[in-house]
Amino acid sequence: MMIASFAIFLSHIIFITYATSNQRYFKPNMHNNMTITIRRTITKTATAIAVLHSDNGNINGTIHFQQDKNSTTISGEIKGLTPGLHGFHVHQYGDTTNGCISAGPHFNPYNKTHGDPTDEMRHVGDLGNIVAGADGTAHIDISDKHVQLLGPNSIIGRSLVVHADQDDLGKGVGDKKDESLKTGNAGGRVACGIVAISA
């Protein structure tokens, strides 16, 4: 009788231990699955800023960059410009020791010719034109899929430059064609600033 009772008691212990162990086995898996799902919904966002000015201090502006999954938004305003269109580009170097000329050529990691921002054949740094109103202020709101703040072709540490003239977007003809495919015939550099990581 004692042996039978002990066997029943032992079977209860074994059953209870198995059930408890089974619950402990599934709970971490449920937790891990939830964690993985949450992590997959997180997207990387990066932000940067460029404070632009001219050598004489008459032109000033602040431009903000925000990169999400699909594109980079470029926004802000620049004051003190002559009314009209001005070429707007990211240049190779974050060097302004000799003014904007030290910034080098357009940022062009894929060795393409200059073009319209909507063209596939364009420099990464080609942002087209900005428009200054009668008061000399240009309001900027650009979305660009080529400009990146993350990765090997990041524009962080490079220069953002405003030019004196309108960018012809690589469509120049005749004696202007060669320069059009390099700079868009956008003229001198009137203001610039280094693109830096923002807080």
Swiss-Prot record:
<feature type="glycosylation site" description="N-linked (GlcNAc...) asparagine">
    <location>
        <position position="70"/>
    </location>
</feature>
<keyword id="KW-0732">Signal</keyword>
<dbReference type="InterPro" id="IPR001424">
    <property type="entry name" value="SOD_Cu_Zn_dom"/>
</dbReference>
<feature type="binding site">
    <location>
        <position position="123"/>
    </location>
    <ligand>
        <name>Zn(2+)</name>
    </ligand>
</feature>
<dbReference type="InterPro" id="IPR036423">
    <property type="entry name" value="SOD-like_Cu/Zn_dom_sf"/>
</dbReference>
<keyword id="KW-0479">Metal-binding</keyword>
<feature type="binding site">
    <location>
        <position position="114"/>
    </location>
    <ligand>
        <name>Zn(2+)</name>
    </ligand>
</feature>
<keyword id="KW-0964">Secreted</keyword>
<dbReference type="InterPro" id="IPR024134">
    <property type="entry name" value="SOD_Cu/Zn_/chaperone"/>
</dbReference>
<feature type="binding site">
    <location>
        <position position="163"/>
    </location>
    <ligand>
        <name>Cu cation</name>
    </ligand>
</feature>
<feature type="glycosylation site" description="N-linked (GlcNAc...) asparagine">
    <location>
        <position position="111"/>
    </location>
</feature>
<feature type="signal peptide">
    <location>
        <begin position="1"/>
        <end position="20"/>
    </location>
</feature>
<protein>
    <recommendedName>
        <fullName>Extracellular superoxide dismutase [Cu-Zn]</fullName>
        <ecNumber>1.15.1.1</ecNumber>
    </recommendedName>
</protein>
<feature type="binding site">
    <location>
        <position position="106"/>
    </location>
    <ligand>
        <name>Cu cation</name>
    </ligand>
</feature>
<dbReference type="GO" id="GO:0004784">
    <property type="term" value="F:superoxide dismutase activity"/>
</dbReference>
<keyword id="KW-0186">Copper</keyword>
<keyword id="KW-0560">Oxidoreductase</keyword>
<keyword id="KW-0325">Glycoprotein</keyword>
<feature type="glycosylation site" description="N-linked (GlcNAc...) asparagine">
    <location>
        <position position="60"/>
    </location>
</feature>
<keyword id="KW-1015">Disulfide bond</keyword>
<comment type="function">
    <text>Protect the extracellular space from toxic effect of reactive oxygen intermediates by converting superoxide radicals into hydrogen peroxide and oxygen. May act in the parasite defense by neutralizing superoxide generated by activated leukocytes, thus acting as both an antioxidant and an anti-inflammatory factor.</text>
</comment>
<comment type="similarity">
    <text>Belongs to the Cu-Zn superoxide dismutase family.</text>
</comment>
<keyword id="KW-0862">Zinc</keyword>
<feature type="binding site">
    <location>
        <position position="89"/>
    </location>
    <ligand>
        <name>Cu cation</name>
    </ligand>
</feature>
<feature type="disulfide bond">
    <location>
        <begin position="100"/>
        <end position="192"/>
    </location>
</feature>
<dbReference type="GO" id="GO:0005576">
    <property type="term" value="C:extracellular region"/>
</dbReference>
<feature type="binding site">
    <location>
        <position position="91"/>
    </location>
    <ligand>
        <name>Cu cation</name>
    </ligand>
</feature>
<dbReference type="InterPro" id="IPR018152">
    <property type="entry name" value="SOD_Cu/Zn_BS"/>
</dbReference>
<dbReference type="Pfam" id="PF00080">
    <property type="entry name" value="Sod_Cu"/>
</dbReference>
<keyword id="KW-0049">Antioxidant</keyword>
<dbReference type="GO" id="GO:0005507">
    <property type="term" value="F:copper ion binding"/>
</dbReference>
<feature type="binding site">
    <location>
        <position position="126"/>
    </location>
    <ligand>
        <name>Zn(2+)</name>
    </ligand>
</feature>
<comment type="subunit">
    <text>Homodimer.</text>
</comment>
<feature type="binding site">
    <location>
        <position position="106"/>
    </location>
    <ligand>
        <name>Zn(2+)</name>
    </ligand>
</feature>
<feature type="glycosylation site" description="N-linked (GlcNAc...) asparagine">
    <location>
        <position position="33"/>
    </location>
</feature>
